[in-house]
Amino acid sequence: MQASELRFAPPSADKSALEEGRLFTPRFDANGLITAVVTDAGDGTLLMVAHMNAEALAKTLETGIAHYWSRSRSSLWKKGETSGNLQHVESISTDCDQDAVLLKVRVGGEGATCHTGRRSCFYRNVKVEDGRPILTENG
C-alpha cells in the first residue's frame, strides 16, 4: 500500500479557530490516534467504533474507502479488504474539538461490518440480572 501524501497541520491553540475555523486539524491522542465512529449512510445504524492514525485518515480522505489503524496488529487496515465488505465513505464529520470523526459509509459485499459476520459490531445489549451485568442479543 502506497504511503499517503496528505498531511495535517497541528491543531490550533486558538479554541475559536479549532471550533469555528475551516481548517481540519485533527487532534490525535498521545498514541497518534483519533476515534472514528462509523454509521450506515442510509439508515444511521451504528456499525462500529475504530481508531485512525494520520495515515489511515489521509488514505480514507484520498480514496473514499475507510482505512483504520489496528491497535492489536499495529498496522494500517483497509476495512473489508479480505471479506469484500469495503466501507465506501459518503461523508466525514468531526466533533467540536476535532478529536473524533464520524464516517457515514455504505458497506459493499454482503454488508457485514463486524468480524463475526454481523452488520454491526454492536449486536449485544448490557443489562443487569440478579445483580450481575449480562449480555443479551439485540434486534
From Swiss-Prot:
Mg(2+) binds at D95, D97, D99. Its cofactor is Mg(2+); Zn(2+). It is found in: Cytoplasm. Keywords: Amino-acid biosynthesis, Cytoplasm, Histidine biosynthesis, Hydrolase, Magnesium, Metal-binding, Zinc. GO terms for molecular function: magnesium ion binding; phosphoribosyl-AMP cyclohydrolase activity; zinc ion binding. It is an enzyme of class 3 (hydrolase). Its EC number is 3.5.4.19. Its main location: cytoplasm. Binds 1 Mg(2+) ion per subunit. GO terms for biological process: L-histidine biosynthetic process. Pathway: Amino-acid biosynthesis; L-histidine biosynthesis; L-histidine from 5-phospho-alpha-D-ribose 1-diphosphate: step 3/9. It comes from the Bacteria. Pfam families: PRA-CH (PF01502). InterPro entries: PRA-CH, PRib_AMP_CycHydrolase_dom, PRib_AMP_CycHydrolase_sf. The keyword Amino-acid biosynthesis applies. GO terms for cellular component: cytoplasm. It catalyses: 1-(5-phospho-beta-D-ribosyl)-5'-AMP + H2O = 1-(5-phospho-beta-D-ribosyl)-5-[(5-phospho-beta-D-ribosylamino)methylideneamino]imidazole-4-carboxamide. Zn(2+) binds at C96, C114, C121. Belongs to the PRA-CH family. Catalyzes the hydrolysis of the adenine ring of phosphoribosyl-AMP. Homodimer. PANTHER family: HISTIDINE BIOSYNTHESIS BIFUNCTIONAL PROTEIN, HISTIDINE BIOSYNTHESIS BIFUNCTIONAL PROTEIN HIS7. This is Phosphoribosyl-AMP cyclohydrolase. It comes from Chelativorans sp. (strain BNC1). The gene is hisI.
